[in-house]
């Protein structure tokens, strides 16, 4: 009587179909980031270039404002010229989250090329512009939309590769916009002097085309795009297994969230005033040849400000750090920039540009972590709240600079009213952010929030 040898069975793998037959809920596809590797850091480098060519170009707004004011569009008011910059920033933040969702669904390989082509095309069209409405369409609308498809999605693409190194990756990527704010203000005025505005802008378009081509080659995602199939599968699952959902709008009713969004809105009312008007102020006070470098100095400070406040926030908390940088931004304008209107010095302009660049860089880098903290890591609320945050930023940017330009137009070549408005609104933004911090973490000052 022969005995059968014991069989060593391999562990069974239950397919989603078998799960469904047995009444088990199908497990979602696990997406574990590689957290490093050659492709991951190549994607970080590519995203750095995307930021350099998009938000970095927008950071050179003061140079364009100065050139338009003095040469090409002398018949336009400061308020009218400010709409060019504000429209870029508004479109960048308004449509950035939507493009980020497109990258999730279709992948960066399909999404980034059209926006890269659009960015280069809009800069080429700017070189042909001679009238205000043409500049508004080419630089304000066309480049603003293209930048929306490159800047915020650059962050999303790079962070997909990391789990524990996301902070470092975001810091490197966001530094691309600050470096752009250093390079463009130094490069463009020199080119304009040598070859004229049209040729200078075309050379810029050529440089951006080369860099964006490299960026598109380097950027990739560790996961396959979700596509429409996952949407249909999710809808089918919801139909067969209905589960109660919490509305994403529920989070908007919380007091911490309301005050935080209000604080971001007021801060954006004043944040771009020094970046847009500091070169013009330096030129009017006798530093014409140095005016072009004020933006480069401010963005050099911002380069450090993107990283250091993030490191500090790991120690004392994101909200505590956010309250400090927003309030300091307003205090610097009122206590440092405003006196320079009456007692102008080259050293004072340099120090103010560095300090303000540092604290304003902290506001830009700390916003998204505060949003995640307010959502309490609930995935169903992070996207909605990030969209609300971007909407507040966009509306603040859209209305802030034109208001400040209108104030300046009433005062002629003086910046006193503009400075008071910008400083007061940023301090008000700091107060609102501080109120949100108290509602979220309590009144104890030393608590990490």
UniProtKB/Swiss-Prot annotation:
> Which Gene Ontology MF annotations are present?
transmembrane transporter activity
Question: What upregulates or represses it?
Answer: The expression of the hexadehydro-astechrome cluster is induced by glucose. Expression is controlled by ambiant iron conditions in a hapX- and steA-dependent manner.
Q: What happens when the gene is disrupted?
A: Leads to complete abolishment of hexadehydro-astechrome production.
What is the first-listed, main subcellular location in coarse terms?
Answer: membrane
Transmembrane annotation, as ranges: 44-64, 80-100, 112-132, 135-155, 168-188, 195-215, 255-275, 296-316, 322-342, 346-366, 387-407, 415-435
Q: Name one GO cellular component term.
A: membrane
Subcellular location(s): the record lists: Membrane
What domain of life does the native source organism fall in? Answer: Eukaryota
Q: Name one Pfam family in it.
A: MFS_1
Q: How does it sit in the membrane?
A: Multi-pass membrane protein
Keywords on record: Membrane, Transmembrane, Transmembrane helix, Virulence
Reported function? MFS-type transporter; part of the gene cluster that mediates the biosynthesis of hexadehydro-astechrome (HAS), a tryptophan-derived iron(III)-complex that acts as a virulence factor in infected mice. Required for the production of HAS.
What family does this chain come from, according to its entry?
Answer: Belongs to the major facilitator superfamily. Monocarboxylate porter (TC 2.A.1.13) family.
This protein is called what? MFS-type transporter hasB
| Gene name as annotated | hasB
């Amino acid at each position: 009587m022969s005995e059968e040898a014991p069989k060593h069975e391999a562990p069974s793998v239950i397919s989603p179909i078998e799960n469904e037959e047995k009444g088990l809920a199908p497990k979602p596809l696990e997406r574990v980031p590689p957290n490093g590797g050659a492709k991951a850091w190549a994607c970080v480098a590519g995203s750095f270039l995307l930021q350099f060519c998009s938000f970095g170009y927008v950071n050179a707004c003061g140079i364009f404002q100065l050139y338009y004011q003095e040469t090409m569009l002398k018949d336009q008011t400061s308020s009218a010229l400010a709409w060019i910059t504000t429209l870029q920033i508004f479109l960048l933040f308004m449509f950035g989250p939507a493009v980020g969702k497109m990258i999730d669904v279709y992948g960066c390989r399909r999404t980034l090329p059209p926006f890269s082509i659009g960015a280069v095309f809009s800069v080429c069209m700017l070189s042909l512009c001679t009238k205000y409405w043409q500049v508004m369409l080419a630089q304000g609308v066309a480049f603003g939309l293209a930048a929306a498809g490159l800047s915020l999605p650059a962050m999303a693409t790079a962070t997909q590769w990391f789990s524990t190194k996301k902070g470092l990756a975001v810091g490197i990527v966001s530094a691309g916009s600050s470096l752009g704010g250093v390079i463009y203000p130094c490069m463009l005025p020199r080119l304009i002097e040598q070859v004229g505005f049209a040729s200078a802008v075309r050379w810029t378009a050529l440089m951006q085309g080369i860099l964006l081509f490299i960026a598109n080659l380097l950027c990739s995602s560790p996961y396959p795009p979700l596509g429409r199939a996952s949407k249909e599968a999710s809808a089918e699952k919801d139909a067969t297994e209905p589960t109660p959902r919490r509305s994403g709008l529920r989070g908007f009713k919380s007091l911490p969230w309301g005050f935080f969004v209000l604080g971001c809105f007021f801060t954006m009312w004043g944040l771009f005033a020094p970046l847009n008007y500091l070169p013009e102020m330096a030129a009017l006070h006798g530093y014409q040849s140095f005016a072009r470098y004020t933006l480069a100095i401010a963005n050099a400070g911002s380069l450090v400000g993107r990283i250091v406040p993030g490191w500090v926030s790991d120690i004392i908390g994101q909200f505590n750090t956010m309250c400090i940088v927003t309030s300091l931004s307003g205090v610097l304008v009122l206590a440092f920039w405003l006196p320079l209107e009456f007692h102008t010095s080259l050293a004072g302009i340099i120090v103010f540009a560095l300090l303000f660049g540092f604290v304003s860089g902290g506001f830009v880098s700390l916003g998204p972590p505060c949003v995640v903290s307010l959502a309490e890591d609930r995935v169903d609320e992070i996207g909605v709240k990030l969209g609300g945050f971007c909407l507040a930023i966009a509306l603040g940017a859209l209305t802030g600079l034109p208001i400040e330009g209108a104030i300046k137009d009433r005062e002629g070549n003086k910046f006193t009213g503009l400075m008071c408005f910008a400083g007061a609104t940023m301090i008000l933004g700091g107060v609102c952010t501080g109120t949100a911090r108290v509602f979220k973490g309590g009144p104890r000052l030393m608590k990490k929030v």
